[in-house]
Amino acid sequence: MKAILLVLLCAFAATNADTLCIGYHANNSTDTVDTVLEKNVTVTHSVNLLEDSHNGKLCRLGGIAPLQLGKCNIAGXXLGNPECDLLLTVSSWSYIVETSNSDNGTCYPGDFIDYEELREQLSSVSSFEKFEIFPKTSSWPNHETTRGVTAACPYAGASSFYRNLLWLVKKENSYPKLSKSYVNNKGKEVLVLWGVHHPPTSTDQQSLYQNADAYVSVGSSKYDRRFTPEIAARPKVRGQAGRMNYYWTLLEPGDTITFEATGNLVAPRYAFALNRGSESGIITSDAPVHDCDTKCQTPHGAINSSLPFQNIHPVTIGECPKYVKSTKLRMVTGLRNIPSIQSRGLFGAIAGFIEGGWTGLIDGWYGYHHQNGQGSGYAADQKSTQNAIDGITNKVNSVIEKMNTQFTVVGKEFNNLERRIKNLNKKVDDGFLDVWTYNAEMLVLLENERTLDFHDSNVKNLYEKARSQLRNNAKEIGNGCFEFYHKCDDACMESVRNGTYDYPKYSEESKLNREEIDGVKLESMMVYQILAIYSTVASSLVLLVSLGAISFWMCSNGSLQCRICI
């Protein structure tokens, strides 16, 4: 009975002890992050670094609408294909959009020489001034300028021709040598386009140009070529057995370009003074053009985001996040989110940083929970919380600032003969993309690991701060909590929290209570030892008596024979 009373006394004393726990904030967040060592760690707060949404629209970029080519492509727009007349009035754009069915390019069959390079040049052009480089009515008085039409380039059901070129043919059975020059006085680069016709037969050559041995010569300070017609039978394309090759050059300011020909020249009528724009580009997209504005455009749609990474499309125009292959890039800013199981008791399961966080701690990341004669409650440690918030905020901002270099990324242009180069370029681009993706993911993993370790360290420092003040005036109960050996009212609790705890003031009371509790424990232990010895002896005697009784019974009924030899 005495032992039972002593045990109850110990339990009663422990229950009434004032207690202080160090712990951290928890909430109902379901955000998860990855670290170097763990995946899907639930945290209280995090920020997303990866944009994965767009609006599915083509929008104005910098307040300027895109040039939607519709069924036309760059070749058709630059040469003036009759099917592209709606584009003739457009002089500025933020970017150029081709669609998957932009097939109206060169209507008269032939090769567009260095077409991919022209596309590359135009991808950085945001506007142009279209002007008549050689006026139709006055530049070619000795040559016919109205007969150069073809059924391959129809308009309104009749034969027509490119709007920006003039197909010169003989006039009154004569094609005199022509020589025409233009001096670039626009103060900017001028795009000049022309063509050379290759008839299928000598009869067609004479019928169109009179001269059998015709040539075309084009020269400037940086361009000098001489062309001769290649007369040969060819299969018909778009009803034409002849071919027409198309050429272009960029004329620098102050430079002169001269055209000389005795036949077969498809002369330039209009040229383009170009204005470069760093954010321009050419994309292929079937998305519709809408009345909207954006800073970043992709073929799938516009992105309005300040995040450093996106996984929507590798081709972008404007101030765009860097494309990566990742599906998740989330950086932790809070703590591990492990809410305590309240049903296990106030100090059983919400035992600070060991077993879980506190949803009741709402005004800080780290703090205290106390229980004394005046009640119980939570109190955040504002200083350590603010220092942590400032440090993590600066780190996140630094990461975003370093990685948030805005990009315009457009596809490179290769013709069909450059497939090996194109494939090699794709492999190189894929390699760079893999490196970017790896760097981004590893950066986030490392920073997440460091942040969570940082929080653990802050909680531990808070615990050590309390332990160094309390010393032997309180007992560590192994779960982030201290059990006081003295009465600790709210003022006392506050002094522990703010670092002004008066150890000598409570040391004498703590010493007496500690000795009393230790004495009770010692006496209780002695009683337990006596009870244990008594129990052992008693159980041994019972066992011996039982064995003797069984043996006597077995001997009396003959089941067991006992012989005593002397």
Curated annotation (Swiss-Prot):
Is Phosphoprotein found in the keyword set? no
Q: What else is known?
A: Major glycoprotein, comprises over 80% of the envelope proteins present in virus particle.
Modification after translation, per record? Palmitoylated.
Provide the membrane-side ranges marked Extracellular in the record.
Answer: 18-529
Q: Which residues lie on this side of the membrane: Cytoplasmic?
A: 551-566
Query: HAMAP family under this entry?
Result: INFV_HEMA
**Any one Gene Ontology biological process term?**
clathrin-dependent endocytosis of virus by host cell
Marked site (Cleavage) residue numbers: R344, G345
Protein name per Swiss-Prot or TrEMBL: Hemagglutinin
Location within or outside the cell: Virion membrane; Host apical cell membrane
What's one GO-annotated cellular component?
A: host cell plasma membrane
| Source organism (scientific name) | Influenza A virus (strain A/Swine/Iowa/15/1930 H1N1)
Residue numbers with lipid attached (S-palmitoyl cysteine)? C555, C562, C565
Function statement: Binds to sialic acid-containing receptors on the cell surface, bringing about the attachment of the virus particle to the cell. This attachment induces virion internalization either through clathrin-dependent endocytosis or through clathrin- and caveolin-independent pathway. Plays a major role in the determination of host range restriction and virulence. Class I viral fusion protein. Responsible for penetration of the virus into the cell cytoplasm by mediating the fusion of the membrane of the endocytosed virus particle with the endosomal membrane.
Which residue ranges does UniProt annotate as crossing the membrane?
Answer: 530-550
A molecular function GO annotation: host cell surface receptor binding
